[in-house]
C-alpha cells in the first residue's frame, strides 16, 4: 500500500469519518473522493503524524501571533506543558493552581472581563492529578467575553463528553493512544472555520510563527 494509492485513500476516508464521530461532530461519508474530513457543521478534522503534544504545538504555532496574549490556567503537568508551548509562540498569562486543585471559575471570569485575551487554552482531563476541568462552563465564559476557546482533549475525547460545536471550541486535540485505544504517535485535531480564517489571515499578513 502506498501513501498515494487508492487503498490508502480509502483508509483515510474511513479514518476521517470515524474521527468525526469520536469528536461528536456531524457525520461524513467514509468514501474516497469526497471531503470525508468535513461534515454538515463548521468543523474539519486533521490527522497528525505525531504525538498529541505535537498536535497541540501545531495548533498554538499556527493560531497565534507573537504579540497575542492568551490565558492558560493549569493544575498539573500537562496543562503546564500547554503553557510552556504557548510561551514559545505568544504571550501568556499563566494561572498556576496547586496540582490537584480545581480551577477557580470566578477568577477565570474576572480575567476574561479584562478583554485582553485572544484565547483561553486548557487541558481538559489532567491525568497527572486526576482532575477534569468544567469545559462547558469555561467555554460559556469564553463565548460571553469574545475569547476563543482551545481544548487539549488528548485524554478526554472518546472517553467522556466532549462537544466542540456546543462549546464553540476553535480547536480540540486528541491522542490516538488514549481513550480511542489506538497506536501512539498519531493524533488528530478538530478545527472550525474561525481557526482556519485566523491562520490564513496571520500568514497573509506576514505575522506567522514558524508553522507546520
Label for each model-derived stretch:
Residues 46-49, 72, 94-96, 121-122, ...:
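General beta-strand structural signal in soluble alpha/beta enzymes
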Residues 103-156, 171, 179:
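Active-site phosphate-binding strand-loop segment of PLP-dependent enzymes
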Residues 164-177:
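Conserved active-site segment immediately N-terminal to the catalytic lysine
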Residues 177-212:
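Active-site C-terminal subdomain of aminotransferase-like
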